[in-house]
């Protein structure tokens, strides 16, 4: 939960994340701020697509969510689909002006754009952002990619504690 959600609304985290088996593939959801946490993304490692709906009241917030969405696509070798509320929200007491853009992100690997961006909407312009997603390509990258980030996650175990401080003089 963001500071506002915790401090103003008293919101607390819920139960485990869910994976939905659909005709479009296995889909998970990381809502906005959740996309900024690798372990939440890792819980969705079996998803082909992770949806990231968001609302941010500053461009810095948009970029944090976008960078998180791109990182989750890289780590899980999947596609992430980010949507953003944009513009004023006079209908809501909780929201001010919102900034952002939609984006469809992928691992920058074989068969995908080297930028990791399948599609990107215009900043603060309402509209749809969409791309063709080839689930066979997702499966191919997971099995035969240049790197196998998703499979090598366990290699971090034991190295993910506090780093050793080394003084160089």
Question: Across the structure, where does each feature detected by a protein language model lie?
Answer:
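C-terminal beta-strand edge segments of enzyme domains
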Residues: 19, 86-169
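Active-site catalytic loop in hydrolytic enzyme cores
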Residues: 1-45, 58-71, 147, 157
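CN hydrolase (nitrilase-like) catalytic-core segments centered on the catalytic cysteine
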Residues: 35-126
């Amino acid at each position: 939960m963001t500071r506002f959600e915790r401090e103003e609304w008293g919101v607390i985290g819920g139960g485990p994340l869910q994976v939905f088996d659909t005709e479009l593939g296995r889909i998970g959801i990381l809502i906005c701020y959740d996309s900024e946490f690798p372990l939440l993304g890792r819980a969705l490692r079996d998803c082909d697509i992770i949806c990231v709906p968001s609302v941010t009241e500053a461009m810095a917030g948009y970029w944090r969510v976008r960078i998180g969405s791109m990182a989750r696509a890289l780590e899980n070798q999947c596609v992430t689909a980010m949507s953003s509320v944009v513009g004023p929200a006079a209908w809501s007491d909780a929201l001010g002006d919102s900034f952002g853009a939609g984006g469809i992100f992928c691992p920058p690997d074989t068969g995908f754009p080297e930028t990791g961006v399948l599609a990107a909407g215009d900043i603060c312009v309402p509209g749809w952002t969409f791309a063709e997603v080839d689930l066979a390509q997702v499966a191919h990258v997971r099995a035969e990619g240049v790197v196998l980030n998703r499979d090598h996650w366990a290699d971090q175990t034991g190295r993910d504690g506090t780093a050793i401080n080394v003084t160089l003089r």
